[in-house]
A protein has these predicted regions:
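Canonical Rossmann dinucleotide-binding motif of NAD(H)/NADP(H)-dependent dehydrogenases/reductases
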Residues: 1-28
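Rossmann-fold scaffold of SDR-type NAD(P)-dependent oxidoreductases
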Residues: 7-8, 53-63, 70-71, 85-91
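Short glycine-/acidic-enriched loop or helix-start segments at secondary-structure transitions
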Residues: 15-17, 67-68, 98-99
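A glycine-rich helix->loop->beta "capping" turn
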Residues: 22, 45-58
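Adenosine-cofactor binding site in Rossmann-like domains, unifying the SAM/SAH pocket
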Residues: 25-48, 62-69
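Hydrophobic/aromatic beta-strand patches that form the interior of the parallel beta-sheet core
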Residues: 26-28, 57, 87, 127
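Catalytic loop of short-chain dehydrogenase/reductase
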Residues: 61-62, 79, 84-124
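A short helix-coil junction within the Rossmann-fold of NAD(P)-dependent oxidoreductases
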Residues: 66, 73-82
Length: 127
């Protein structure tokens, strides 16, 4: 059985649905595990913790591009050690249909772009 780590609050939204499907998964957030993932030192702590798991799911979206930053921290370690699977939850908001000053679409677009880069590594396109 795979060990799953989820960055997200299991009492809310998509993380709650993941908890229903995978009740043995471990969840971390400000309220679960005392990890405020907007703080770089906590992102590094998450990355180290993730090494004990086979699958990492990034659900928690935190302002100022923190979701992309904490996915990067996890990915750096996992790439170095050829470890597991990363699933990052994006949003259709990354392709807005009208102009907006809201940063959320830009943050999700950055996450999508970063994850595409990661997929090229896993596909061996850098060899």
């Amino acid at each position: 059985m795979s060990k799953i780590l989820v960055a997200g609050n299991p009492d809310y939204g998509l993380s709650k649905a993941i908890k229903f499907l995978y009740p043995d998964a471990t969840f971390v957030s400000r309220t679960h595990g005392n990890l405020d993932l907007s703080i770089p030192s906590k992102q590094r702590e998450l990355a180290e913790l993730s090494m004990d798991y086979d699958i990492f799911i990034a659900v928690s979206c935190i302002w100022r591009f923190a979701q992309t930053e904490y996915v990067q921290e996890v990915a750096k370690r996992w790439i170095e050690r050829k470890h597991g699977y990363i699933i990052a939850i994006g949003s259709s908001a990354d392709t807005p249909v009208k102009g907006t000053a809201w940063m959320y679409p830009a943050e999700k677009k950055a996450l999508r772009s970063y994850c595409r880069q990661l997929s090229q590594i896993s596909a061996g396109e850098n060899d």
